[in-house]
Design a protein with these regions (language model features):
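Transmembrane beta-strands of outer-membrane beta-barrel pores
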Residues: 36-42, 99, 121-129, 201-209, ...
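Residues on the lipid-exposed face of transmembrane beta-strands in outer-membrane beta-barrel proteins
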Residues: 18-22, 100-106, 181-185, 221-227, ...
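Flexible, surface-exposed loop regions and adjacent strand-edge segments
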Residues: 7-12, 47-57, 133-143, 149-152, ...
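Outer-membrane beta-barrel transmembrane domain signature of Gram-negative proteins
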Residues: 62-73, 133-237, 242-246
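Transmembrane beta-strands of outer-membrane beta-barrel proteins
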Residues: 30-34, 115-121, 195-199, 233-235, ...
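Residues that define the transmembrane beta-barrel architecture of outer-membrane proteins
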Residues: 10-14, 94-100, 175-179, 215-219, ...
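Flexible loop and strand-edge segments within Gram-negative outer membrane beta-barrel domains
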Residues: 1, 7-9, 13-79, 89-97, ...
């Protein structure tokens, strides 16, 4: 019944977060992160935008919140902001989310110095539900003054109901799974030759309750060489794919290359070190796409 509901805006939320780093061995590190929340919200079935848009249209003295006899007034077809906020019923929603991440890093220096292997796995999930129960508010307008007993003469503008109507529910959720593995190499030889390389594979699967699920994955690589901290050459590539395209056209190869010159490291720039601390010239060319 209408006496059993509460339109007051209330919010309760519980958060949890835990980050754990473990060093299993001198060359092996593991990280596990988990976070999430539980949330419950109670409010009026009318949106905040609707309530405030009506309130901004009326001056405070245009009509009372209630007539002296208890009836609720309304102005033309606009309704009554107070009644919209307190007399229409209630909406209750709940939401929950969990985010997890697991990563592993293995130093492969026993094979060759500067070589590392990394892996990451994450799983996220979100869900929400909402139940709305509402009724029609009974509105009255002042007709013509007062009767012989001094009571206001009112005319019914809109017939209301005493009970909340059938509930309307809405549910939504999504989940995401992400995986990544990379092999990294970073080493400097005889203090002049800096070599770095990276090879990375990733995959993401996303399932949304309001759309078709999709998945994409790719392979990326990078190799760079720096001589004496001044001359740089770099090559990158991406081989990316998605199931959004037809078979045979789901993958694309996107390479790029660049060369650079760190002018500020040259001997003739040293007198200007305090004025120009970093000056670099770079030229690159690459291909991008979807």
């Amino acid at each position: 019944r209408s006496l059993d509901w509460d339109p007051t805006i209330k919010l309760q939320r519980y958060n949890v977060r835990s980050n754990v780093d473990l060093k299993l061995s001198p060359t092996t590190q593991v990280r596990f992160n988990i976070g999430g929340y539980l949330q419950d919200r109670n409010s009026s079935p009318e949106s905040t935008d609707q309530i405030f848009s009506r309130a901004f249209r009326f001056t405070p003295f245009m009509f009372p919140v209630r007539y002296s006899s208890g009836e609720i007034p309304a102005w033309q077809e606009e309704g009554n902001p107070w009644a919209m906020a307190t007399q229409r019923g209630f909406a209750r929603s709940s939401a929950s989310k969990i985010e997890t991440l697991f990563s592993l890093e293995q130093d492969l220096k026993f094979l060759t110095p500067g070589l590392k292997l990394r892996g990451t796995f994450s799983f996220d999930r979100y869900s929400t539900g909402k139940v709305t129960r509402s009724k029609t508010v009974e509105y009255w307008n002042a007709a013509s003054g007062r009767n012989e007993e001094g009571e206001l003469i009112l005319a019914q503008k809109q017939q209301g109901s005493n009970f909340l109507g059938t509930s309307k529910s809405a549910e939504y959720g999504n989940k995401s799974i992400y995986m990544e593995a990379s092999l990294n190499y970073d080493r400097t030889f005889v203090d002049k030759h800096a070599v770095s390389a990276m090879l990375l594979f990733n995959r993401r699967h996303y399932d949304d309750g309001s759309a078709l699920p999709y998945r994409n994955q790719g392979l990326a690589g990078r190799a760079s060489y720096t001589y004496n901290g001044k001359y740089v050459a770099e090559f990158n590539f991406g081989y990316n794919g998605t199931e959004n395209f037809a078979k045979g056209k789901r993958y694309g190869f996107f390479p790029s290359a660049a060369v650079g010159w760190i002018v500020s490291e040259e001997p003739f720039m040293q007198p200007l070190r305090n004025t120009i601390s970093k000056l670099k010239l770079r030229a690159s060319y690459g291909q991008v796409g979807n």
